[in-house]
Swiss-Prot record:
Example GO molecular function: ATP binding
Residues that, per the record, bind ATP: T65, P66, A67, G68, E69, G70, K71, S72
Family, similarity comment: Belongs to the formate--tetrahydrofolate ligase family.
Keyword Ligase in annotation: yes
Catalytic activity entry: (6S)-5,6,7,8-tetrahydrofolate + formate + ATP = (6R)-10-formyltetrahydrofolate + ADP + phosphate
A Pfam family the protein falls into: FTHFS
InterPro entries registered for this protein in UniProt: Formate_THF_ligase, Formate_THF_ligase_CS, P-loop_NTPase
Entry EC number(s): 6.3.4.3
This protein's name: Formate--tetrahydrofolate ligase
Major enzyme class: ligase
UniProt KW keywords: ATP-binding, Ligase, Nucleotide-binding, One-carbon metabolism
Length: 556
């Protein structure tokens, strides 16, 4: 079998102007970045706003193994399969972060014969969105430090600046830094730090904004620091939201590319799901809904993170809720949740599949709490056995959830046809009646408790000393009306990554709350989740290269 990059490079690409005609987009509606990438114009986005939205399919997963469970690959394969069975389909995915590409992932544009193309461009600099977001974020950092240097008219307490700098790389050595060292002309010395760009509030804002006006309003509402009297300081106090929006004026436009099978795909925005809300842009998803009969999108990591945030944070900003949710499961992950060591996952173990099924079952039950139909997709691997597959199908039948085997990695669209038909049937047979898990009027504590008890299966939520004080403080500022965004390990329902399966009798401890008032949510930090990842001992970058003719090597 060829590698992902070899498959991608063997596919003859069609001009993007030809691909997008399938969904009613003309060449004049595009801002081209070469022959195979484009941004969609604001004029076209506005012109389709009156269109009735099509069906929305959200792809999520069980709690993953470190290698991931192929959620992006399944999303792409499902979209291609829907196209193949005659459905007018679009795909709406996140764009990769360069940090994990160079770190552990090596790429994030699907895999095998279910990829978005050109994969090298998408995995590297693409259309420059990450650069624009990084620049806008760090421009604000520079403006804050300049304000301190120029007399600090707003009375900002340098010890209480909460706006860190960002970089689209994994670099643990930048988590905590000191800026302003040297002579007085170098600024006011203070503690600072770096997050990865996909954890930036600017990224979240770009992904939730509905247009440039909304983008500017959200940027203005970012909390950057506190004064000596502990009152919050906003971007609007610095009067720089216009400049930040200017830097982002092109980045907010959704990017268009193609799948191997030729399905039009929006790839736009990329917040992580463990430290941010984990969904691609509202603009891309909303526009896809108004252009196609079926839109396939995804939310990062497991359904306890990405799907919960999609349904509680993103969905209220969309023209409609999902019509169906596909939960991707692999037998290797179920066996790991059933207690099998990583080294033994390739061996048949039906007992471990039965035990690990508790993880999948809880995810299915959770999605049903939102009143949305669920379909399980088994992402097939060559090490899967007939006995293990049969056991999983029987277990799914016991909880009355449709299940289909999908081999889109190996077979592309053909490997996803059964899944596509199952999803279409689920939508036709069972109407979604979406309801949120909590109301805006609920307190932050009530919202967090609902997530911990209803989604994670825990006993309750505990608050550390800092978080306890912040609950009172945030209520005074009116921020308790915002939804919550949990920053938690992706490997477990709990905040302990080693607690696999479907644990109960555990508490989640919130150590800190972070206001993301521009994005419109409050981040709750749990465990030791880092907002600036580090690199592994052997980074994927060590296997990457470029040939003399400019061909990329080692992306996967």
């Amino acid at each position: 079998m060829k590698s992902d990059i070899e498959i991608a490079q063997s596919v003859p690409l069609k001009p993007i102007t030809e691909i997008v005609k399938k969904v009613g987009i003309d060449g004049d509606d595009l801002e081209l970045y070469g022959n195979y990438k484009a941004k969609l114009s604001f004029e076209k986005i506005k012109s389709v706003k009156g269109n009735k939205p099509g069906k929305l399919i959200l792809v999520t997963a069980i709690n993953p193994t470190p290698a991931g469970e192929g959620k992006s690959t399944m999303s792409i394969g499902l979209a291609d399969a829907l196209t193949k069975i005659g459905k007018k389909t679009m795909l709406a995915l996140r764009e990769p972060s360069l940090g994990p590409v160079m770190g552990i992932k090596g790429g994030a544009a699907g895999g095998g014969y279910a990829q978005v193309l050109p994969m090298e461009d998408i995995n590297l600099h693409f259309t420059g969105d990450m650069h624009a977001i990084t620049t806008a974020h760090n421009a604000l950092s520079a403006l804050i430090d300049n304000h301190l240097q120029q007399g600090n008219e707003l009375g900002i307490d340098p010890r209480r600046i909460i706006w860190k700098r960002v970089l689209d790389l994994n670099d643990r050595s930048l988590r905590q830094v000191i800026v302003g060292l040297g002579s007085p002309v170098n600024g006011v010395p203070r503690e600072d730090g770096f997050d990865i760009t996909v954890a930036s509030e600017v990224m979240a804002i770009l992904c939730l904004a509905t247009d440039l006006k909304d983008l500017k309003a959200r940027l203005a509402n970012i909390v950057i620091a506190y004064r000596y009297d502990k009152s919050p300081v906003y971007v609007r106090d610095l009067k720089v939201e216009g400049a930040l929006a200017l830097i982002l004026k092109d980045a907010i436009k959704p990017n268009l590319v193609q799948t191997i099978y030729g399905t039009p795909a929006f790839v736009h925005g990329g917040p992580f799901a463990n430290i941010a809300h984990g969904c691609n842009s509202v603009l891309a998803t909303s526009t896809a809904l108004r252009l196609a009969d079926y839109t396939v999108t995804e939310a990062g990591f497991g359904a306890d993170l990405g799907a919960e945030k999609f349904l509680n944070i993103k969905t209220p900003n969309l023209p409609k809720a999902p019509d169906a949710v596909v939960i991707v499961a692999t037998l290797r992950a179920l066996k790991m949740h059933g207690g099998v060591a990583k080294a033994d996952l390739t061996f048949e173990n039906t007992a471990a599949v039965r035990s690990g099924f508790a993880n999948l079952k809880r995810h299915v039950e959770n999605i049903r709490k939102f009143n949305i139909p669920v379909v399980v997709a088994i992402n097939e691997f060559v090490t899967d056995t007939k006995a293990e597959i049969q056991v999983l199908k029987e277990l799914c039948a016991e909880i009355a959830v449709p299940v289909e085997l999908a081999s889109v990695w190996a077979k592309g669209a053909d490997g996803g046809i059964a899944l596509a038909n199952a999803v279409v049937s689920a939508i036709a047979e069972e109407s979604a009646a979406y309801k949120r898990l909590y109301a805006d009027k609920d307190s932050l504590e009530e919202k967090l408790r609902a997530i911990v008890t209803e989604i994670y299966g825990g006993r309750t939520v505990q608050f550390g000393p800092k978080a306890k004080n912040q609950l009172k403080q945030f209520a005074q500022y009116g921020w308790d009306q915002l939804p919550v965004c949990m920053a938690k390990t992706q490997y477990s329902f709990s905040d302990d990554p080693s607690l696999l399966g479907a644990p109960d009798q555990f508490d989640i401890t919130i150590r800190e709350l972070v206001p993301k008032t521009g994005a419109g949510f409050i981040v709750a930090l749990t465990g030791d989740v880092m907002t600036m990842p580090g690199l592994p001992k052997i980074p994927a970058a060590m296997k990457m290269d470029v040939t003399e003719d400019g061909t990329a090597v080692g992306l996967f």
